[in-house]
């Protein structure tokens, strides 16, 4: 009969140096947590209102400094497409701020110059992980092509005249239209062999903008996409799914908080009524209070994690950082001021 081996008690060595180090680390965590908590509590019980110009300006300048110092590259440590999306979202902020200041010609000039630089910077990202492992029919995949094309649209809306960017918008829109029209299921892949239908919303919105600017009919690509999404809702939540299989009827991953927030931020421009229905259901099922006057959004239904092919940034107590952050945009575009 074999004898059970008892492991010896763990030996813990405590030195003055280790004590000092632990105290220092605790102070760092407490100081950063305090600043974050104070910032959150300052917004407790507030309904939607336009942010003060100085607040927008200070946040924008801070993000500008971080991107120019290379901090965008660090985001790739959290999600594979983090660096790309950091730059794209920064570009969207340039467009939005400029549109909110129609008489500020000096800022618009700055915005156009920064957008030209930004587009030049992110275009080579199609050759980086994870975008380089996609189908050659849509190089970089729909996340890459859709967001960069929408950024071109913003540049043109602001009055940009760079001929390369304008020509790229034409060719990129045609490429996306063909990709959606020929794909079965009716959405191109996001990464190599992987498809998340909601990732197509940015691409479809860029096609809508091309139609408005140049009188094309690329928005027809929305019809097949919408029909598939409406007929393949998650049976558990009656919300849009996150990931589909390669065939036309397989649901790989049901509703996800980050995917819903991402898509609902733009869905009103494609189908306002469908977006209203989806947002109302999403708000009722997925929004969770987590402090005095604060709301977060679950990453999974009822906060219970399921097996998945992809992560979506930090998740704490079921609440998703990406789902909650993107949910602010979803709330605004769906007229939720609470």
Show the residue positions of the predicted features:
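N-terminal Sec-pathway targeting helices
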Residues: 3-29
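Extended ligand-binding groove/face enriched in aromatic
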Residues: 79-82, 86-88, 92-201
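Low-complexity, Ser/Thr/Pro/Gly-enriched N-terminal "stalk/linker" regions
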Residues: 26-89, 93-96, 112-128, 163-174, ...
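Acidic/His metal-coordination segments adjacent to aromatic residues that form catalytic metal sites
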Residues: 68-76, 123-134, 181-189, 236-250, ...
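Short, hydrophobic/aromatic alpha-helical segments in well-folded domains
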Residues: 172-175, 190, 206-209, 225, ...
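Well-ordered alpha-helical scaffold segments within catalytic/enzyme domains
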Residues: 38-43, 88-106, 147-162, 202-215, ...
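Extended ligand-binding clefts on enzyme/binding-domain cores
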Residues: 143, 164, 183, 194-322, ...
């Amino acid at each position: 009969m074999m004898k059970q081996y008892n492991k010896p008690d763990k030996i813990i060595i405590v030195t003055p140096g280790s004590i000092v180090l632990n105290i220092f680390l605790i102070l760092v965590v407490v100081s950063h947590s305090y600043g974050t908590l104070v910032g959150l509590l300052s917004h407790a019980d507030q309904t939607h209102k336009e942010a003060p110009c100085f607040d927008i300006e200070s946040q924008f300048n801070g993000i500008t400094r971080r991107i120019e110092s290379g901090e965008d590259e660090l985001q790739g440590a959290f999600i594979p497409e983090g660096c790309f999306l950091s730059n794209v979202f920064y570009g969207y902020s340039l467009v939005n701020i400029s549109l909110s200041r129609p008489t500020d010609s000096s800022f618009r000039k700055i915005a156009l110059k920064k957008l030209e630089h930004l587009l030049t910077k992110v275009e080579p990202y199609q050759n980086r992980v994870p975008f380089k492992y996609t189908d050659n029919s849509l190089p970089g995949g729909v996340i890459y092509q859709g967001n960069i094309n929408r950024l071109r649209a913003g540049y043109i809306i602001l009055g940009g005249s760079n001929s390369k960017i304008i020509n790229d918008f034409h060719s990129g829109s045609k490429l996306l239209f063909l990709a959606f029209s020929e794909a079965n299921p009716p959405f191109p892949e996001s990464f190599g062999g992987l498809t998340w239908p909601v990732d197509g919303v940015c691409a479809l919105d860029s096609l809508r903008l091309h139609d408005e600017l140049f009188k094309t009919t690329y928005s027809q690509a929305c019809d097949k996409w919408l029909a598939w999404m409406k007929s393949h809702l998650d049976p558990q939540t009656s919300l849009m799914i996150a990931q589909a299989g390669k065939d036309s009827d397989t649901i790989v991953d049901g509703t996800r908080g980050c995917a819903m927030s991402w898509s609902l931020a733009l869905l009103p421009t494609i189908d306002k009524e469908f977006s209203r229905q989806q947002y109302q259901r999403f708000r009722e099922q997925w929004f969770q209070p987590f402090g005095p006057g604060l709301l977060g959004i679950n990453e999974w239904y009822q906060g219970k994690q399921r097996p998945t092919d992809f992560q979506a940034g930090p998740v704490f107590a079921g609440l998703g950082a990406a789902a909650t952050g993107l949910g602010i945009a979803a709330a605004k575009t769906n007229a939720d001021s609470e």
